[in-house]
Amino acid sequence: RQRQMCIRDRLSAACAAILFSATLSPAEYYLNVTGSPNSTYLELPSPYARENLCLVAFDGISTRFSDRRKTAIETAEILARAASVREGKYIAYFPSYAYMKLVCRAFCGIAPDIAVVMQKSGMSYRERERFLHVFSSEKHRHVVGFCVLGGMFSEGIDLSGNALIGAMIVGTGLPGLSAERNLMAEYYQNTMEKGREYAYIYPGMNKVLQAAGRVIRSENDRGMVLLIDDRYDLPEMKLLFPPHWRHIRYTRDPDSLERILADFREER
């Protein structure tokens, strides 16, 4: 509540304020957490052609914390099969460094011919530049970057054209359980009757949308977004998909996933 009041006070000190982002959704959530429930809200459609984005949810794997070790190899296999359909540059996003490293080790054994670069904790400016240079240079033609969802490489980077042709998002981005989050959930449950949504689901989906938005950066870009988690088939998650995601396809079969991606590749 204190954070909400601080934002509201700062906004009310100005004659007017404009907040904009491609991921301010759902509107009700952001209007309430900024203390501006009665503000005007405008939602514009995506300017990019829907057929330029291949969007697939592989909902046959659980990436919940308790299941990660036992599904790590299966997750790595799905990433490898998806990245093998078309040579190019991809980023795979994970909810934590530990999980990312676990799957990356398995991936390297499954797909040794695909180059791998991994985000490190506390990277310097020069290290970040070297990481991004892998995608903008022609030296590596087939590479998968392993990154943390919600981190420095899941928002605020612009890799257009062939610099990035796919984002593979492992998990739903939900924040880890903590005392702070539970207090937030309790507060929003008492005030909005949406404690779990405001404390966990909406912030998580925001990170997913940010990462997915790295792929299509101009009207000429074509690429794929792969969501990996069985929870993407839940109604509460589907309600949060933006309008330009209505063409999403679901599969639990690795062979079917390859066919979907191959068909998209042939449409070029």
Regions found by a protein language model. Name each.
Residues 1-4, 8-268:
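ASCE RecA-like P-loop NTPase motor cores
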